[in-house]
Amino acid sequence: MRRRVLLAAAVLVALAGCAGPPSAEDGDPPRTAPAGPGRPDTAAPRPGRTGEAKPSPTGSTTPARSPATLLLADFGADTVTFLPADGRGRPDAVRVGAAPYGVAVGADGRAWVATAEGLAVVDTRTRERVARVPYRTRTGPVAHGEYRGGGMGVALAPDGRHAYVGVNVPDGRGTLEVVDTRTLRVTAVLPVGRRPFDVDVAPDGGRVYVTAHDSFEVTVIDPGDGERGSDAGGAGEGGAPRVVRRVEVAPYGTEGGLGSWLKPHYAAVRPSDGHLLLPFEGERLVDLDPATGRSRVRRMTAHTHQHGTALTPDGHLLVVGTGPIDPAEDEGPSLTIRAPDGTERVVPLDGPHENVSASPDGRTAYVTAGYTREGWRDGVTAVDLRTGKTRWLPGGTRPVGVAVLE
């Protein structure tokens, strides 16, 4: 699969949806946004408990642990699902808000779930939604589907004091909202690019990175102390959050604009140097230095459209291949397992998948099958990262985001 130029217009028209305007596939009826004050609402407790999320070990030689639980963001519903990772036991769903997308779990066991209605807070030990923080950004009526407004990517500061959520504004540029995790208040709103699929944080917490799909860019933000916020200049480094720079990430160029498939989706932050790794089409891996805005492009081998990323504790990069843009030239869905030295293994997957999370011991990848376009399924594929063997775990409702709980 070679892309010296963009694919022919006919192919783009037939398949355009990865980044274009809303289409008929998003047939879910819109919902009316609930009225209420600009403060978090709460939900009634749910019975049941699960293990608290803990820091990951540093290597992949850790002895086998007790079975984990997966926390799935059910993009096709208004729930998160607790799914036993060993395939035993019954899934447990908790209502969080319409069309949840991204999920991040802190060391205190609280999960932060980006929904169309607000940033939901779930106690993973009691399995209850304890709050939902409304966005300050106006996103229109609450809806479902690929282009719905509301939260997408979400991440936590290393000290757990702030949550960062990328908010999509249909037909416009998005925002990054900063939430104080103690007071459950939005403390700053900053402008970012269109459709902020992914939010990542530097290992030391000194920078936040927002990958905006529709505008081919990464916004680099100095989170400061998490209060207020500005578009450029001033504050930062302990003051108000500010935008440091915007970096175009387009190894194939930006021709085609919203109709192009060749956009960034998700990034992974390499702990050794803080660089962002952004995969494209199973051919090119952009290695971006966010401190300078400079990047290098490295070769990949899966030859398929790519979305979700994750890093294992020992530094292997996992990349989800959703399937071909052009079936005549491209390969099918897959999981790329890329070693720190750049060598790759490609594990075929059954049908499109969206995102991935690794087990803390680095032995297993959990890949969600709730793709944002057609072809999605209700479940997760577990991949043994040593043997490449796969195992299907049914559960969730069009799950997109995933976190591993112990």
Q: Where do the PLM segments sit?
A:
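Predominantly soluble domains enriched in secretory-pathway, periplasmic, or organellar proteins
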Residues: 18-406
